[in-house]
Amino acid sequence: MFDGADTVVLYEELAFQTVLPVQWRPTPNPTSDIAAAFSDRNVRLLQAWDAMEEHGPTEKTDENSPAAADLMRLELKINLLLDLVGQLFAANRPRPTAVPVRFNALGVVWRNASGPLPEAGAQGVAEIYLHDALAEPLRLPGRVTNVTPDGNIKVRFLPLGEAVADLIEKLAFRRHRRQIAGARQPRRT
């Protein structure tokens, strides 16, 4: 039975944890206006990322039907196309090193892989590259609340706007639900 011991939490809220490229861009006094300016783009990025996440079939399809085979081939071609586009983006736009990151609508924590560490209290924008096929990063303005000597950086976001916050919370919840379902699956030996 799932006991919640592996639940990923940040600022006392369910969080999303994975390995992604992340960087910090210092900016003087980010305001709610900056978060609003990033909002539409962040919503589109989160919606695209959600569409790319593998959710699996909602209903068991008839694998013998010709339509199922066509859909599977189409899905494989789209995945191949996304991989190729991602490789082109990666070749033309270098990204930061992928690091373990945990984030939700309230903040983010990651280990800095290179470069100088920001100071606690520094203001700026956390940039999280969600997928190789997405050209732009998620841009989340906030303030550094803690920096550890080994390079862990914790940022509290400015209010991101309802649409962005809802999408981040939804994605964190889905990931958490899949982890619970995976923990409940009997292991095959």
Q: Which ranges hold each PLM region?
A:
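Structured alpha-helical
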Residues: M1-T189
